[in-house]
């Protein structure tokens, strides 16, 4: 009933808007021309010429009509979605590194972290986004303690994205439909601006309702339905020409029955006996959890940029983000879920961040300096609790209520300072930077005495880490067309709470029962070299061609990794040597090398545009992940297969029409740790076959109906069966025809 009412309201307001705008005079300003830019990474943007950076603008985002943020940026070279297609089952992999601590995710500048077992790590609604920036690698002193793979910055929409010149009040309505899972998306916005144009307000809401996805063979990915609601409030206040204050608030909820492991695909069917005993509905739900997920994000930014004072460009930011997942199994579920968060669980991850920095610009003789200095304070909190009804009568398990031993509670505090000087001399830019981090890890004792026995090493005491990171960069503009660059960084990270304080019960058959207070910092040296060629007016007036090539080499040391397999040097040769009685659940492996290359070519003109990209990554550990004392190197399982993308399209500016084709070609992946260590199956992913996917897209803004836009996107045009390697062979989705109709007022 609510959906029917929403549809009627949407159609009514759209028709009213058409009548108000059908006779409006067309705007021929540059902002209207921006609507015609191709739906690819925009090569005209100077920020996209930075080494290692990929940018998706609003038109890219809207044209894809992606269901989740990870799938949205999967088109970028070196960036891959990992996991399956169920709601909340996606993570990111950048150049072969995919752990949550390796990929830093920010929403409007707020750090977001979530590392729940077998779950995704990002829950950002694409409908809210206006821009996504991916900086590959860790080459900036503004970021420390991890993020080796890179930083993904999601930026939400703002009032200026909807208002025309001199417009004081505006609105937005959008309806979307996907054929594969019968998804319906409703988005609406109210935009306000005062007479002085120094205060604006955006209220934005989106609802996403979808059924189960279908595989290419038309079978359903069971329990992949999506019921999601998201809201955004953003205020900009230009207090004076020198002072700007921005507040953004994002809130999202998702509820529904789904498998505990959202990243997985195949769900075992209930037995015929269970169906006869409980009925089909309850029999299925005994294998599921009812998930209640909430995601919050608050950011307050202040900028002070006085006129005629190059020494001050002050920026401060205070942010808070919180993600909660409460899972409940049905009453008739069996009490055997200790390893999957019990019969009920309450999980909360939160991040509190404060950053203040200033950039001073000055000259020393013939060199120009941009000196950045900043301070940071961060607090990451993980609160975990589960209820296991099989332990309800056991005192040593706190009568069923305790923290999962593999997902401990705790806090991590980071205090940091950073400094960078960017020096420009003629056509050379040299940058050097340093960063100091002091980190405090504080564990929380488990409610269950079973996991609080100091005699077997279950110690939740505070552990401190500190150290410096170093950054160097060089960019040489050979001429107007060619730029060469190289970067180097030496950075480190402390263990996250899981790695420091995970334990096992004291009656465990093996000696690996302790927390891991003896862990050392994980170190990495990162190097990249490359070049950028930019040619303007190549074939016709106002066209642009850009070619970029990058090679990177990452050398990691003291990799923090779970202790399984060979537990001590004494039995490294698989002898019967007895190890010490207390061994931590995590240890430092000797090291690894990840290297690769990216080739990118983009062309855009008034009428034609296209792109070709290619990314290649390979990586090896010095030893087996299960035997750090071995002499045989092994492939790293999380390295993605080679990927190439291509796109070709055209614009008809007279009719505000854009259409094109995009394809993705993925090689097979058969490199596995098993080839170096046949017993390393636990750390391996199934081999995958290569595949190609073809998509079509179309965008049209009728000239006579100002503010209206129609988009059509067809994913997997040929309904090709495929199983992405990083999805652990979870099936891809079948052909999906996406349609959206939007109206700005």
Curated annotation (Swiss-Prot):
All disulfide bonds of the chain are none
Start and end residues of each TBDR plug domain: 45-157
Signal peptide (UniProt feature, chain positions): 1-24
In which compartments does the protein localize?
Cell outer membrane
List keywords of the entry alphabetically.
Cell outer membrane, Membrane, Receptor, Signal, TonB box, Transmembrane, Transmembrane beta strand, Transport
Membrane topology per record: Multi-pass membrane protein
Q: Which Gene3D superfamilies match?
A: TonB-dependent receptor, beta-barrel domain (2.40.170.20), TonB-dependent receptor, plug domain (2.170.130.10)
Q: What residues does the TBDR beta-barrel domain cover?
A: 168-745
Which GO terms label this protein's molecular function in UniProt? Answer: heme transmembrane transporter activity; siderophore uptake transmembrane transporter activity
Q: Does the keyword Magnesium apply?
A: no
Coarse class of the protein's main subcellular location: membrane
Tell me which GO cellular component terms the UniProt record holds: cell outer membrane
Q: What does this protein do?
A: Heme receptor.
Q: Which family does it belong to?
A: Belongs to the TonB-dependent receptor family.
UniProt-listed PANTHER family? TONB-DEPENDENT HEME RECEPTOR A (PTHR30069:SF56), TONB-DEPENDENT OUTER MEMBRANE RECEPTOR (PTHR30069)
What name appears for this protein in its UniProt entry? TonB-dependent heme receptor A
Q: Which organism does this sequence originate in?
A: Haemophilus influenzae (strain 86-028NP)
Which classification does the entry list for the species? Bacteria, Pseudomonadati, Pseudomonadota, Gammaproteobacteria, Pasteurellales
Q: Which gene encodes it?
A: tdhA
């Amino acid at each position: 009933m609510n959906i029917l009412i929403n549809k009627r309201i949407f159609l009514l307001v759209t028709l009213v808007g058409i009548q108000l705008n059908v006779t409006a005079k067309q705007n021929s300003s540059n902002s209207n021309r921006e609507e015609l830019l191709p739906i690819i990474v925009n090569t005209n943007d100077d920020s996209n010429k930075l080494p290692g950076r990929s940018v998706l603008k609003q038109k890219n985002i809207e044209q894809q009509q992606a269901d989740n943020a990870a799938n949205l940026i999967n088109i970028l070279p070196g960036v891959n979605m990992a996991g399956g297609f169920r709601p909340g089952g996606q993570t990111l992999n950048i150049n072969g590194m995919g752990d949550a601590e390796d990929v830093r995710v920010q929403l409007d500048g707020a750090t977001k972290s979530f590392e729940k077992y077998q779950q995704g790590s990002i829950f950002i609604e694409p409908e809210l986004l206006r821009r996504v920036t991916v900086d590959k690698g860790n080459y900036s002193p503004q970021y420390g303690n991890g993020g080796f793979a890179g930083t993904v910055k999601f930026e939400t929409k703002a009032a200026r994205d909807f208002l025309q010149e001199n417009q004081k009040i505006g609105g937005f309505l959008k309806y979307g439909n996907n054929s594969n899972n019968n998804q319906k998306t409703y988005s609406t916005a109210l935009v306000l601006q005062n007479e002085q144009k120094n205060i604006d307000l955006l209220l934005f809401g989106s609802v996403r309702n979808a059924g189960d996805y279908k595989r290419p063979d038309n079978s359903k990915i069971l329990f992949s339905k999506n019921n999601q609601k998201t809201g955004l409030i953003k205020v900009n206040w230009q207090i004076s020409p020198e002072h700007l204050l921005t507040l953004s608030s994002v809130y999202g909820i998702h509820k529904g029955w789904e498998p505990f492991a959202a990243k997985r695909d195949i769900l075992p069917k209930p037995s015929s006996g269970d169906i006869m005993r409980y009925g089909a509905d309850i029999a299925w739900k005994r294998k599921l959890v009812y998930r209640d997920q909430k995601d919050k994000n608050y950011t307050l930014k202040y900028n002070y940029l006085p006129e005629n004072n190059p020494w001050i460009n002050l920026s401060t930011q205070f942010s808070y983000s919180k993600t909660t997942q409460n899972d409940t199994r049905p009453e008739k579920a069996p009490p055997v879920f200790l390893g999957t968060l019990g019969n009920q669980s309450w999980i909360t991850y939160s991040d509190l961040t404060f950053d203040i920095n200033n950039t001073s610009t000055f000259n020393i003789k013939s060199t120009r300096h941009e000196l950045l200095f900043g301070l940071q304070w961060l607090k990451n909190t993980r609160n975990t609790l589960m209820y296991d009804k099989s332990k309800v009568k056991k005192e040593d398990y706190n009568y069923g209520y305790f923290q999962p031993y593999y997902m401990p509670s705790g806090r991590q505090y980071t205090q940091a300072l950073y400094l960078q000087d960017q020096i420009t001399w003629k056509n050379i830019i040299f940058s050097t930077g340093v960063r100091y981090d002091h980190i405090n890890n504080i564990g929380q004792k488990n409610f269950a005495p079973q996991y609080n026995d100091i005699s077997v090493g279950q110690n939740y005491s505070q552990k401190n880490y500190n150290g410096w990171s170093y950054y160097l960069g060089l960019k040489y503009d050979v001429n107007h067309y060619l730029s060469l660059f190289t970067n180097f960084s030496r950075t480190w990270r402390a263990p996250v709470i899981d790695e420091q304080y995970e334990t096992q019960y004291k009656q465990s058959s093996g000696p690996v029962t302790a927390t891991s207070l003896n862990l050392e910092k994980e170190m990495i040296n990162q190097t990249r070299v490359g070049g950028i060629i930019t040619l303007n007016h190549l074939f016709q007036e106002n066209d642009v061609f850009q070619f970029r090539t990058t090679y990177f080499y990452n050398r990691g040391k003291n990799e923090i990794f779970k202790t399984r397999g060979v537990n001590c040097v004494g039995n490294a040769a698989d002898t019967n040597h007895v190890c010490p009685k207390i061994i931590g659940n995590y240890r430092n492996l000797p090291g690894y090398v990840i290297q690769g290359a990216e080739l990118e070519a983009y062309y855009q003109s008034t009428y034609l545009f296209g792109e070709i990209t290619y990314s290649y990554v390979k990586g090896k550990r010095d030893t087996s992940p299960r035997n750090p004392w071995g002499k045989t190197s092994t492939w790293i399982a999380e390295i993605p297969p080679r990927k190439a993308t291509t796109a070709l399209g055209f614009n008809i500016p007279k009719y505000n029409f854009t259409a094109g084709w995009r394809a993705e070609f993925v090689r097979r992946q058969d490199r596995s740790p098993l080839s170096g260590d046949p017993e390393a199956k636990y750390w391996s992913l199934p081999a995958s076959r290569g595949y190609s996917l073809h998509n079509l897209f179309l965008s049209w803004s009728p000239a006579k109906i100002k503010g209206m836009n129609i988009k059509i996107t067809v994913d997997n045009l040929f309904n090709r069966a495929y199983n992405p390697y990083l999805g652990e062979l979870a099936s891809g989705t079948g052909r999906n025809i996406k349609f959206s109709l939007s109206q700005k007022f």
